[in-house]
């Protein structure tokens, strides 16, 4: 077993790993992680948002239907801002673990690993701050000595919010035939989140996830990742490694958009593989509605019964607690598959 002395800033991920290993819970049917080096890297579809509006919308709709993921350039988020965000992010995660976990930073939004992990296949080798947009500028949000972090996070959140809205409105227009600037309803700074992620180098990378396979329980996600790589998505029943592109943001469709679009747009399973040598950083923006917001549909007939985001979120959390796995949209089908399991 490799020795791995964790520093003062590192979360006790190795302790979690070894505890699960001692329990002998290695294999529960989830395919083991696969190093990105063993897969062909693919560049996602790239859409330049400064191009012709109709052509951009068509390209995004095709990518959302075929891939569930795409990249956008010409997004208006300055490279200098993203680089500043990365510097501040590194300073934040270099703080002592006890300060991050118990110091109340960023409204106590710190999390690490997978508290509900019942086996190694449920363990995520990562740490994060998951921050509600409204709290970023709130006077009660504690940034400690990181005086520049508040302003940088606010700028990044505002910029990513504009990108998310632009993409969401364009994708919706392709299905309903007209422009609806308020789409999706119920999404504002009190319901959307900015997540700062760090994936530490992992000595058990061969059989550990950086982030376990999942789909996103939102309308859509906008991601800025570094150049380390590790993001993989399911395409044609196999995992595909996403090739990082420094000038692009990644957009992926969430479960709520798939339901609203009557399955035209795909919420695709994705994961992050652990890296034995390098740490990885990313920033994600989640476009979410209020808990009481109906998800709705672009038109009937819809394969899904009516539900709110709150109902969906509660069901996902209940499934994870009961089974260790997210079931997601199949729970809300009007006509579930025989046996009641996922499609």
Regions found by a protein language model. Give the residues of each.
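Peripheral, non-catalytic segments flanking oxidoreductase cores
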Residues: 1-343
């Amino acid at each position: 077993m490799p020795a791995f002395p964790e520093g003062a800033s590192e979360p006790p991920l190795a302790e979690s790993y070894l505890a699960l290993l001692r329990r002998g819970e290695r294999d529960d049917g989830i395919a083991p992680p696969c190093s990105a080096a063993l897969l062909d890297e693919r560049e996602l579809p790239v859409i330049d948002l400064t191009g012709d509006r109709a052509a951009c919308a068509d390209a995004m709709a095709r990518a959302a239907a075929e891939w569930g993921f795409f990249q956008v350039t010409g997004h208006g988020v300055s490279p200098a801002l993203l680089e500043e965000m990365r510097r501040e992010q590194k300073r934040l995660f270099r703080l002592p673990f006890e300060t991050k976990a118990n110091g109340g930073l960023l409204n106590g939004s710190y999390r690490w690993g997978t508290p509900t992990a019942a086996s190694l296949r449920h363990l995520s080798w990562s740490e994060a701050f998951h921050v509600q947009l409204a709290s970023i500028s709130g006077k009660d949000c504690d940034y400690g000595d990181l005086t520049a972090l508040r302003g940088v996070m606010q700028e990044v959140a505002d910029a990513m919010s504009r990108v998310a809205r632009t993409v969401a409105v364009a994708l919706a227009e392709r299905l309903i035939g007209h422009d609806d600037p308020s789409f999706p309803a119920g999404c504002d700074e009190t319901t959307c989140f900015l997540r700062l992620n760090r994936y530490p180098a992992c000595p058990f990378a061969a059989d550990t996830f950086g982030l376990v396979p999942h789909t996103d329980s939102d309308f859509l996600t906008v991601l800025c990742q570094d150049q380390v790589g590790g993001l993989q998505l399911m395409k044609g029943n196999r995992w595909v490694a996403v090739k990082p592109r420094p000038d692009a943001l990644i957009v992926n469709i969430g479960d709520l958009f798939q339901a609203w679009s009557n399955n035209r747009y795909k919420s695709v399973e994705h994961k992050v593989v652990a890296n034995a040598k390098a740490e990885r950083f990313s920033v994600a923006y989640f476009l979410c509605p209020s808990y009481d917001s109906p998800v709705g549909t672009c038109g009937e007939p819809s394969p899904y019964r009516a539900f709110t985001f709150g109902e969906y979120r509660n069901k996902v959390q209940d499934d994870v607690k009961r089974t260790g796995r997210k079931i997601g949209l199949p729970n809300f089908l009007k006509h579930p598959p025989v046996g009641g399991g996922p499609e």
